[in-house]
Amino acid sequence: MGGGRRGGRREAEEGVAVAGRSRGVAAAAARHEVAGELELASAGGLGGGGGDELVDPDQLTYIHNVFKIDLYSHVLVNLLVTICKDEKLQNILGHFQKEFEGGVSAENLGSQYGGYGSFLPTYQRSPPALSQSGSPAVLPNHGSASRSPYIPLESVQKNHFVKQAIDGRRKNNYCQRTSSENDSNHSQQLLNSGPEQKTAKIRIKVNNKCLERNNAAIYSGLGLDISPSSSIDDSPQWSIEAPESKLFPDESADTIFQIMTCHSVPGGLLLSPLAENVLELRQKSTAVTKKHEAPVYDNDKEELQRNCCHTSSAAPDNNYQLVKKIKLDEQRDHLPEFENSKYRHKNATIMKKGAKPELKDISDEIDSIRAPRCAKTEKHAVGESADFIADTSGRLKEAKNGQFKGKGSTQSSLSIIDVKAANSANDDKHPKGKAKLKVTLVRNAKMESSLDDGFSHKTKSDKCNDQPVTTSSQLQIDPAKKTSLKRDRGKVVCAKDEPSQYKSKELRSLVDAESMGTTTENVAGNSSELLKGKKVSALQASLFGKKLKIKTHKKPNYDTTRKPNGENEGYVLDHRNGSTYLHTEDKSLKTEKESATSGLTDKDFSGGGNDGDHKISPIVVDKSASMPSRCKNETTEASMAVPASEPVDQWVCCDKCETWRLLPYGMNSDTLPKKWRCSMQSWLPGMNNCKLSEGETTNAIRALYVVPIPENNISLDSRCDTATLVRSNDAAIMSDNLGMPEISKSSKKLHAPRNRDGLDCFPKLKEKQKRIESSDKGEKSTVTISSGQTMAKDRMHRKRKTSGADYDNLIASKKLKKVYNEPPKHQPPQFELSKSRPSTKGSLKELPKHTNISPGMGKHALPSSGKQFCDGDNSDRGARASDAGKSDPRDLFIKKNKSKQMQLRQHGPDPRPSDAFAKHVVKEVLSESNAAKEKLGSDLKFLKVDDHEKSAHARGPVTGTNSNAIFSEKEDLIEQHLENIHFQHPLLSESSVRRNICNVQASTAATSSSSKVSSSHKNKPEFQETRTSPVESVSSSPLRTSDKKHLDRHRTNSYAVAEIVHSQESVKTGASCSKEKYGFECGSDHTKPHVSGCSNRVMHQDALEDGDLDKQNILTNGVFNNRSSGLGIRNDQGQPNSLVEQKVNSHVLPIHGSGDFRRPTPDQNGKTLPQYNSNQSDQAKLSSGKHPTQVRPDKGNVEYIDLKTNPSTVAGSKLLPGLNNKVNGNASNKSKQSVVENMKHAAIHVDASTPINASALLKEARDLKHLSDRLKGKGDDLESANICFEACLKFLHVASLKEAAGVDSSKQGDPINTMTLYSDTGNLCGFCAREFERLKKMANAALAYKCVEVAYMKAAFYKHPGAIKDSHALQAASVIAPPAESPSSSASDVDNLNNPSTIAKIVSTRGLCTSQIAKNPISRSNHHLMGLLAYSFSYDPFCLLDKVEDTNYAFEGTRKSQSAFFSYLSGIEKDQADGIALLTEVLNFSFHNVKGLLQLIRHSLECINHERFK
């Protein structure tokens, strides 16, 4: 039987022939294409013998394998069709089935095999008899792709799996085993054996290593079964190799992918079906000159430090930058590495699982800037710079289309800028120390300012004046000016031939090399010579850093604008500190010093300026002026108080009708298309028509949308405010740091065209320039600031006839959106209060934004504020170093976006010690009915608040030794809630401070001559809405809303302090209110605060003699070291005078009425304690710790002024006690810091937020973070996470200290602002939380996530100043204690805020559907979350969209903290109840009280750790 079977099988095998062509080796004959025909050779029968024995089941294996091998072949179909049509083959297969079944049935094998013949065609099987026919079955010819003949070995009784021999290609791809040589020989013998008359048609290689398989395994091998038992257990080898052997390598997806990726392609391109331009998206372009991005500023370098940090990354609108040569002694500008910022650097979200976020390094000194250090590059001489530029040019061309990514994602491509410097270091040729630059601007620059940049300038090339400049160190070209670029292509701009677009100081600033991909050159002048011997102390360097610090918010710098004459305000701002950093050796830095402009001629920017040798001397530096040490210029530091970021009006201009439309509050015009028309307006249904006037749409917006009230008590339009503010780069940078709302696209937000109504906003620009070049004559007297710098000052008699006329014209011409740059000729800039557009149509709500006139100021504030800057002012700023970087505010504002204007005005919290503040005098606004009372006794000052014409006698006129009346609000504004001050006391606000030097603003008579000038009174009905009484409409009462309590909340920090010292001359000449002011009398032994009852005019200081001015310290050098109090005054010797700060909780400091106000005047030692009768909270506490109401005069020199006030009627007007002025300038006189009580919280310790403490905490936090990194590198993850979390807590603590000063502004000198610090800290806390989760420390993770929530909510709080107002609204609503609670409950407002009833009230007041929140089960069960929701939705929808990212992060942190907490609960033991209670308390704690939260967190950590080690 065995022999017969073998014989039959051999015959069957030999009967198979391959007729045709075969490809490849015999073992893989014709696998890929039909190479021939298969036929069953008729060799005389299947063996001639009998029966079933002639049919060997192994033939079935052969056939099966043929099928299986060809299963995935394209020949399979043809093969099956051919086989199925052949009867003989059917007979053979039927016989095989019967023979093969031998004891195995389909039932036994299971349905998965589908009956053994499931692989066969469904033809009727032939009876067994046919299969036993003596004649062999002949397989008809058919195409075959490949064969897999398997011949069993002689020793094997059962079927064996024989592996097909594959061609070389399959061997290479799938690495299949090949038979050993013995196997090959053996198979060859098998093929050649047999009857000689029969020749083998095919050569078969058999793998003798295959294991024996049962029938089920065979079927499984055919792919008919995926059962692991058959395919894996029975034949592990087959199961592993089967997929490989059955797929064609070129048809498998994996194979295709391998072919795509493993073969090198010429050019390094990836073989991919994707378009090449799509693949390029993966590539990141790098700035060509990145390696030159350059050195951190050196403490010894004075000039560069001022500008080195201003990079295009900070200001997204760097449309163009020009390459400047760097001087031998100057350092290259370096680009701070920004964290990404979304803003915040688009902070890595807390959900981000990436690497540990890098928190910006915070400098050891709080005043120093901590931009991440970039690799220092060598200083390049002029020649070296030229060579480098030439070398760079080629790469610039190559990188022409590359994106130079800065923070603002500004896309710019410069082909090349070739700078040639001619003997820049040669003073003989250039006596001014200026380098003549011939800048060949190859204008292949394609500037694309992303929408986020906020500066797609719409202005036409003839309106370049309106084009804002993003940073002081950057030149900007409007994309719209491409035409002018083309015209100027290849044009050589000579320093003498083109008006300077930068102040001489500006020339010094380095242009950011990386963001524009170009190198920078400093053309300021012989910086090497000037810097020689002018080393700046470390303190100065840190102060520089302070000013240079840039946050990478997508916010453009709001404080810099390009002046119409091409000057860049930003650069002027750089020198805000009394030109401390000016090259004082240059007598006058005139326009000869030409900043190679970015190819735009002066015409481009000034709308047709003198292109010839028209010289602009932005600032004349007195050569004799001493370079005051930074230590003595602390006042300037204070003057650089950062403008608080406040909701600003966003405007959009219709491209069709050229009409400006006010956007709803919170809506950013960046979201609008570049081409915008009135018809696209959707927020005012039915008013999307160009036929409607601007006023109509504006009024509609005012009516429909709640106008955010100035948050920091800063009158929005304060000219002085903005002017001084704008003057400092610090302010500009700080504004960015504060995360002010992004300026809307320049195309949408630029001020209305200058000549919109035929009025030239800069009619006197040329005249001003000429005046600057020529010395001031006639009316102007030179005022020497303590810094030794001189400024021209108009000794004008403040008759506002001209001012009023101009102002009316401006209003008529609807230049409301512009700053009025045409102040009266005789009005010095320092007295100019507000240039912002007073809205004739806007309601009072709108008023704060457009005018510095507080509602109380009524009609009068405007003239002084509107036209304050006169030509004399221009000369002052332009020609005097004393202005220290003060740029011409008129020019500034005209070029600023409306939103920027508003912000600047709003953020002008820092009173500038420069002329504007040096000469600040108290502007007292008299009520309308009391105009007649302007006559003042020489020693008497009538402070009229209401119709009650009450006068306050300055019984003890305090003699002022050497100080002019300077109101100096210290950086303290930053530390204290400016919004409260400004909100409550717009007059006391910084803007008002600038308007009213002392913040002491008595109401003016509505009938005063200047009252007619103001348009603020025109919309009385709207004003009425916000006023409590008509009297208040003209009183100096603060800006009012319908809710009086609302104002009270903001009044908490009305600590405005003013030195009210009137010079004896002015006192004697008290007849003219306009001349009267608060000044320090130099001749007397006692400082006598004289409150002059000037009308709305800002008192100019005519009374001061030149000599007096020289003696007087205008606070230019005053040190505002009282961060918490914000007011510090130094005498001539730089000694700090006592600082007096008052917090008036009532609407105003009682000036009239029943309350008697005794103000202690400063004694010899400068000790002054204000005593207020209005409220206990109004008492100012001195840092000395003495009782606020007690004054202990040292020498009996303290004099009291009795001021009777009626708090109820005088809401809003506050007379802050005059700052004490040191009589002798004794060094012993120490400045005393006063802390303003916060309404909600106890007064913060005076030293809590001092730079020393904050700096120490920052250093500790940074060191801990670095230690954490090192530990993590060593593998100690848990300890690393613990230390990192400790660093987070310290960062939060520092942020809370900074927060104490002012909610909407960051500390003036701080290297980082509060918002950014909170954001970065939240990111770091998120990292710590994820680490704790990974380490299964769920309690710690819950605490870390809580910190994430707090940090991001605080960041959102700071990013949107409107939160302040809404927060106060929440607090006001919370005043009504819930049932069962007394109003005097010890529960804080924050706790009340979390009360469900309070939330419901607030939500309803904000127009939200309370029912929606009530229906939320989470809200109902989680009061804390409801508090967050109330806060989040306390804005209108547009504001909500802006802050959605931060709030999302905060809520994510809340959710994860709860999740981690529950995970912790699931694994704790009973003895850990204390830890649970503390943890619960922390998680439910409000984010407002950061310090309290930190204490709870530390306590909770101690408890958790203690329980862990029990």
Curated annotation (Swiss-Prot):
Residue positions binding Zn(2+): C654, C657, C678, C690
Molecular function GO terms recorded: zinc ion binding
Subcellular localization, as worded in the UniProt entry: Nucleus
Keywords for the protein's UniProt record, in alphabetical order: Metal-binding, Nucleus, Transcription, Transcription regulation, Zinc, Zinc-finger
Effect of substituting W676A: Abolishes binding to histone H3K4me1/2/3
Biased composition (Polar residues): 174-196, 467-476, 781-790, 1026-1040, 1162-1182
Regions of compositional bias (Low complexity) in chain numbering: 1003-1016
Ranges annotated as biased composition (Basic and acidic residues): 454-465, 479-497, 556-574, 768-780, 874-893
Zinc fingers (CW-type) by residue: 645-698
Disordered, as annotated region: 174-198, 449-497, 555-574, 582-616, 768-893, 1003-1050, 1149-1194
Described function: Binds to histones H3K4me1, H3K4me2 and H3K4me3 in GST pull-down assay. May facilitate the recruitment of effectors to mediate gene expression.
PANTHER family: CW-TYPE ZINC FINGER, CYSTEINE-TRYPTOPHAN DOMAIN-CONTAINING ZINC FINGER PROTEIN 5
Domain topic, free-text comment: The CW-type zinc finger domain is not required for nuclear localization.
Name assigned to this protein: Cysteine-tryptophan domain-containing zinc finger protein 5
Native organism taxonomy: Eukaryota, Viridiplantae, Streptophyta, Embryophyta, Tracheophyta
